[in-house]
Amino acid sequence: MTGGISPHPINATPEIQEITNTVKEQLEKKLGTNYSIFQAISYKKQLVNGMNYFIKVKTDNGYDHIRVYEAFKGTPNLVSVQQHKSLEDDITYF
């Protein structure tokens, strides 16, 4: 059953870091930058026809929120990004 975004952030797991690593190049290309720091901190998820992951990522410039869609048995793809976030900023749907 599909639904809303999970209410509380979850600490990033190795699986979430792997998803984050998979879309790093997509994000760098989109933003025209290269990151030496790209660490998943926490995330929320939303079950759709696949899974949306809303991930707080620590970067060289602070924190970004990225939205990644992963189809069932598919490859993760970057959907969107919110830049200039802080560690304290809540992860919300975007």
Swiss-Prot record:
Annotated compartments: Cytoplasm
Record carries keyword Cytoplasm: yes
Cellular component terms per the entry's GO annotation: cytosol
Keyword Cytoplasm annotated: yes
SMART domains in alphabetical order: CY
CDD domains: CY
Record's keyword terms, sorted: Cytoplasm, Protease inhibitor, Thiol protease inhibitor
Record-marked site positions (Reactive site): 3
One GO biological process term: hyperosmotic response
GO molecular function, one term: cysteine-type endopeptidase inhibitor activity
Main subcellular location: cytoplasm
InterPro entries: Cystatin_dom, Cystatin_sf, Prot_inh_stefin
Motif (Secondary area of contact) on chain: 46-50
Family (UniProt): Belongs to the cystatin family.
General function of this protein: Intracellular thiol proteinase inhibitor.
Protein name, UniProt field: Cystatin-A3
